[in-house]
Structure formats: structure tokens, C-alpha cells
């Protein structure tokens, strides 16, 4: 029952258990007589449907044109947002777990504008498609070729982003996922998105509205103040988002569909442990692409994706998630687990909580995760092809071959150590590692990127 109350979209509106309207962000919207009648009637399909509302008693839309300093409320807000999208503008749209930055997915100039303003020159952008046809994928299939498993995932209640192959005739803006054969596709997951895509009549780029690496923005005032130089306009609603949940991302790997990121609609993710813990544990995660995990008895709950732990806001959201998981599940952690890297924000946070702490080496954690997912006993040889992580010898490790089992790993092969110019920047700029390896081997190497001081 707890899982039913917390998981999926309810995670972003529930304040406390039990899952009743007064304990959600819908408490600010008193039911009108008609909705109240449906809510209290045991024979009605909306009986105790906690978010039930109608245009007269539910959340309202507002549109703010930041470039023209105009505000429109009510039904006209949607029309105003559509007009700006058709004009090639970037519009920030409030969803269930946060805001998206949206623009016309077939307009190269609009996508270029979004990339320039968000300082995101190359990373692929997700595309939201209108629901159409018997299975909802008629428009998707004009641009992509989802297989059966991908189609089922696209239309599932979670509505994740699914990486799927482009069609040869795909005429989306070529700078959405330049040089790639795949596109990150997803369908509308809220009534507002459905109305927006239906009104627009075509696909829209929908990327997280955030400062790069931070958690997705959720507050109306925050998104206007922090992304006023990115979005031309803002489509708000007035239902508070209790906690952020970014879009989940899935892809087919070999014969199975794998989550690359869990989030809105499929988190907190509950997993069964093959053993029983003597006391509750909270795992703080690493520094990049952070999540929080809470484990007790024979289960573990993994939070939605939080982001990089480089900013005060990231730490604030991290602390909220750690606190809320314990409150929502009625479990208080007695031990904290953290990455052994002393420079990580999560490492320092765990050390300041006044609880027993266990350090875990970065690549051993990845190896143990692989074993846990496979659920096969015995000895393993695991190749951890990961970015930078602190190793047991005090150096920064990269691709490692680890033999053994969880709790008893030994490194049996690795790259020869080399100096890493820029430190952990090399994790995001792999050419630095390539240049360093060339220097170490004393072999000729190509030119460094222009305007970079590394060559000097």
C-alpha cells in the first residue's frame, strides 16, 4: 500500500501519508459541489480520486511573455503559448515533476536558439510527440521506428523518454541529435501536455528546464528568474510541485529494455534485496547523476534522478529527497553509505550527519550493482568502464577489471596510470585523457581544441 501511495506521479504532489487530498498539493484547491459529489460517492469512478478537479475548482493556467512583458490567464494562456511556439520561440512549460523548455522540433533555428541559450551545443534533445492513431504512436512512426518493446514502453503509464531508431525519412531538425541514428521520443504525460501537443499539431523539443547539471526547476518564480535569458515565455499552472522528478530515460540494450535514468512516473523505484538488513541504511550516492537509496529489511527504494552535486540547489534538493524518503516510508536510517572520494559533496554531507558512515569505492560499487541486477551467485569478473572515481590506492581510476564478489573485489587489470590534465574535467572532455596518453607513450598526437591552454 505504501508503494501504491508514493510511486509514480503522486510522488511530486504528496506531502505526507496517508495519500489523502489534504496531504497533497491539491489541498489548496477546495472541491466545487459537483466534484465533491463525485469524490464522496462510492459508486463513482472518481471516489476518493485525490487530484480530482474541474476548470472551476482546479489549478489554473497563466502565460507570461517574458520578452513582451505581458501576462495572460485562463483558457487564453494555452493559445498564447501555442502562438509563441509557432513563431519559433522557446517556451518553458510546467509539468508534473518540473518544467520543460519546449520549441518546434522541426525548426532548426528554434533548436539552435535553445542550444545557444542553454549552453548545450551537442547533447541530444528529447522530443515529445502528439498522441494519434489507435495505439497513440501514429505521429511517432513518422519520425522513428520503435520496436514492440519500445512501443509498449512509450505508451506505458510512466511515459518515459525512449531511445529509438530514426526513420530514413525523419525530418526533425537535424541539430536535435546530430550524427546519431536514434531519437529520444516520448508522449504527453499530463492533460496540459496533451492539449499543447494536440493544438500544436506536431512534435516539440522538450528538454529539462534547469541550469546545466542541476535538478529540474519546479517553482514559477524560480524558473522566470533563473531561465529568463533562456525562455522567451512561460506557461505556468498554480499547483505546487512538492518535489522535482525529471523525465525517466530508457533504451534497448541487447534483448532487454534498460533504464538509463529513473524519474517521473517510475520512481521511487522499489527493489527486493536477497538478504535482510539488520538496520536501515541510506546511501548518498556519488557526485554526478546523483540519486538517494533507502534500504531496510529486505527492500531498497531508489529516488528519482537528482543531478550533479555541484551547486547549493542540488544539495538542497538532495537533502529534501533524503529526508522525504525516510518520512514517506516511515523509516529512519541508522547508517549512511557514501562514495569514498573526500571531495564529493555527498561524502562531506554524510560525514556531518552524526551517524555511522561506511565508505564504498566508486568502481566496486558499479561492479556490485551489476551483480545485484544479474542476481547470480558465485565469483565474477566485471569490467567497470566508468568515468573517474577514487581508487583504493589514492589515484583516480577509470576503466577497471574487478574480480570477486560484492564486498570482496580485487583489481586484476587496469590502464597504466597517467597524469590527468584538468583533473575530473577529463570525465566530460575525453580528449584530455587521449592527449595525456599520447604524451605518456611519447607518440605523436593531434591538435588540441582551439583556444585551450592545455597545449601550452
What is the predicted role of each segment?
Residues 2-6:
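Short, small-residue-biased leader/transition segments that mark boundaries at the very start
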Residues 19-26, 38-42, 198-275:
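Internal gly/pro-rich beta-alpha loop/helix module
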Residues 91-92, 204, 330-342, 358:
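Short glycine-rich phosphate-binding loop at a beta-alpha junction
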Residues 127, 133, 236, 308, ...:
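Glycine-rich phosphate-binding loop plus the immediately following alpha-helix
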